[in-house]
């Protein structure tokens, strides 16, 4: 699970010690207490709006999942967590669906007297049993790594050069307008 202070009370990250510094106005690490504890809904909204990025390639239908965070280690950890949770959710959902189908088909086999219908139902049970076996066999169920999450070595943003250029440009415009 995502450690809530890493998401909601994050202030900065020390690359030298690989430690997270929390905003003491929001979260006090020594007492493990919040000024006002955020709700799950607030945390979800912040995670999906500020950190999680999903992109689908129109040509290949590949989905890219990425997480942005000042700490590249947290970004990697959260990316792996999202992928694992989605895989686990859909695996369990499909497993439950197949188990219900097998149960229903077995009931129908017990209730029918026609040998032809029993044979067709038995084949359907066999197909669902194959699905169940494959569901448990795949480590990656929905999402599979093409390029596994990695700790990025270079900062992705903000671009200091771009910020300096914009500030210089705005300074030049304001000096022309004010003079």
Regions picked out by a protein language model, each given a short descriptive name:
Residues 2-142, 148:
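Soluble oligomerization/assembly scaffold segments of membrane-associated complexes
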Residues 128-170, 179:
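Interfacial amphipathic helix/helix-coil modules
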């Amino acid at each position: 699970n995502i450690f809530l202070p890493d998401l909601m009370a994050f202030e900065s990250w020390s690359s030298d010690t690989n430690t997270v510094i929390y905003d003491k106005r929001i979260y006090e690490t020594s007492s493990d207490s919040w000024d006002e504890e955020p709700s799950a809904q607030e945390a979800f909204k912040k995670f999906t709006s500020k950190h999680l990025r999903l992109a689908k390639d129109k040509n290949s239908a590949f989905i890219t999942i990425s997480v942005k965070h000042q700490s590249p280690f947290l970004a990697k950890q959260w990316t792996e967590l999202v992928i694992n949770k989605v895989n686990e959710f859909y695996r369990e959902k499909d497993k439950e669906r197949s188990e219900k189908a097998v149960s229903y088909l077995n009931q129908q086999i017990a209730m029918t007297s026609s040998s032809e219908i029993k044979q067709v139902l038995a084949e359907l049970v066999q197909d669902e049993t194959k699905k169940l076996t494959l569901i448990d066999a795949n480590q990656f169920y929905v999402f599979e790594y093409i390029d596994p999450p990695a700790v990025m070595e270079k900062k992705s943003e903000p671009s200091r050069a771009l910020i300096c250029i914009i500030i210089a440009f705005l300074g030049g415009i304001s000096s022309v307008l004010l003079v």
